[in-house]
Amino acid sequence: MRFSEKFDVIIVGGGHAGTEAALASARMGQKTLLLTHNIETLGQMSCNPSIGGIGKGHLVKEVDALGGAMAAATDEGGIQFRILNSSKGPAVRATRAQADRVLYKAAIRRRLENQPNLWLFQQAVDDIILEGERVAGVVTQLGLRFESKAVVLTAGTFLAGLVHVGLANYQAGRAGDPPAVSLAARLREIGLPAGRLKTGTPPRIDGRTIDYSVMAEQPGDSPVPVFSFLGSAEQHPAQLPCWITFTNEKTHDIIRSGLDRSPMYTGVIEGVGPRYCPSVEDKIHRFADKDSHQVFLEPEGLTTNEIYPNGISTSLPFDIQYQLVRSIKGLENAHILRPGYAIEYDYYDPRGLKSSLETKAIRGLFFAGQINGTTGYEEAAAQGLLAGANAALYAQEKDAWWPTRDQAYLGVLVDDLITRGVSEPYRMFTSRAEYRLMLREDNADMRLTEAGRKLGLVDDVRWEAFQRKQEAIEREQQRLRRTFIHPQHVPQEQLQQVFGKVLEREYSMFELLRRPEVSYEALLSLPQAGEGEADPQVRQQLEIVAKYQGYIDRQAEEIERLKESEHYRLPLNMDYSEVHGLSIEVQQKLNKQKPETIGQAGRISGVTPAAVSLLLVHLKRKSRKAGNTADQVA
């Protein structure tokens, strides 16, 4: 049966990628349908109850700067907030929040249900409708045919999902949810390059059976941080601490005793797990010299006693899980509410995607989230927003948009995926970005909100707040540059207190703010300083720009130097065997991967700087023959 309504964009899946994709497409004015197997699980946090962290918090801020929901929902559902790396430079500082699962999910669903241009429908998708090499819609379990111009697949771990506990396994998308077996088979039938990955989760514990008195308490930060640029601490519900304990030699012996029944160590699981979120059995194998590992006990919410023991993800048999949990200090009488498990699932080689996250093989079909080989809510949300926005642009027959590596962590994420592919679940870190001083959490709006506004992703409220912030920063910067502090007009004791020494001459306030030891707040305590700005976001920007301007300028110059070759377009139908001087290995890799730009080509493993030079020569030669200049990205 054909559904009566036709849509511009269909989103398959209601996790973190799917919800951001649906909201983005609808914000851009496209008639959007979100299909999910269960409306009750929209925005569900399937694994740990936290958002953000190193690199991940940066992605959340970028999603927020583009009008996305994740940061705002975290502000409404966050029960503990911390700034990680607070003692380090601004490039690597990152926000992390524990979230109440129920409140977070409710905040996401409320946004979905109240978003104009967005329809929700509860049905699992079994098939994709193709017309030649173009997508035309989807077919659900009931045989309902939904037609659309573009489709975004955000299937998470559901594609041929297989849950493992010990040597027992069963088909599931996650514990308690059915897998997408028919859809997985259909995608493989189409011939897209597939592989298997795995991820895992720890057993959940009843907090009433935990002895917190023998553990270290880990409170949140004060004053309490916020995630969204439009957020405030008043939005946060009650705040709770986390607790820290450790595994021990007894724990490790118990784990070793069960390895002969581990699906990972007996070869039952084929998929590769995440390097940076390993199972506890993987930890004791990889770090055999360590006699203990940290375990963070994280509350799942304000209205439940359920605790998430971060650090002991496992797929060992339940009897081993029971023993290992009870061997940990403070958990001697712990009651397990849900067993830990591993889940194995299909993913598709992201080198088969364009920078827009559209598949190269099928026009109008976009992938986002774990289907692309990533791990993490934040990575999924960022991809979802980008895929949803580009699906909306595709439906309008407009050019695709994506941020570059020097513009956003989202740009780094996508570029890494489509040029290098994945051999294990991909997690974002600040170390993956060459220009991380430019890509700070605090300036995500400065980098992306204007682009989001042009795309139609950013509403009037956010845009007006952003403009006010920009104007306040510019106004105060000018004031700091023209306001001077004269040492004769300030008591010596106060100068000593603020600057650690006496000033020898007159300085502008901006010059003084550039000093590492001088804060904006301390500067305003001087009698000639004036009132200053009250907005903490404005204050933060003023201080960072003053102190790091030299480094930022040098990085900007480096980016400009690289842009010329970085952005040269490569034709997707180019035959690299025709490029004189390229090795057979490089020819094969380029013909297989079909990079879109010279920059992408240079980041493919095995493609040397010499090979890039040959490509540039080849392009210029062809360009001269054609009588025009090489096409460059605008």
Swiss-Prot record:
Binding site for NAD(+): 273-287
CC terms in the record's Gene Ontology section: cytosol
Alphabetic keyword roster: Cytoplasm, FAD, Flavoprotein, NAD, tRNA processing
Record-linked Pfam families: GIDA, GIDA_C_1st, SAM_GIDA_C
GO BP terms, alphabetized: tRNA methylation; tRNA wobble uridine modification
Subunit details: Homodimer. Heterotetramer of two MnmE and two MnmG subunits.
SUPFAM superfamilies, per the entry: FAD/NAD(P)-binding domain (SSF51905)
Purpose of the protein: NAD-binding protein involved in the addition of a carboxymethylaminomethyl (cmnm) group at the wobble position (U34) of certain tRNAs, forming tRNA-cmnm(5)s(2)U34.
Name this protein carries in UniProt: tRNA uridine 5-carboxymethylaminomethyl modification enzyme MnmG
Superkingdom of the source species: Bacteria
InterPro entries for this protein: FAD/NAD-bd_sf, GIDA_C_N, MnmG, MnmG-rel, MnmG-rel_CS, MnmG_C, MnmG_C_subdom, MnmG_C_subdom_sf
Record-stated family: Belongs to the MnmG family.
A GO MF label: flavin adenine dinucleotide binding
Cell compartment(s), UniProt: Cytoplasm
SMART domains assigned to the protein according to its UniProt record, in alphabetical order: GIDA_assoc_3 (SM01228)
HAMAP family: MnmG_GidA
Amino acids binding FAD: 13-18
Organism: Methylobacillus flagellatus (strain ATCC 51484 / DSM 6875 / VKM B-1610 / KT)
Cofactors named for this entry: FAD
Gene: mnmG
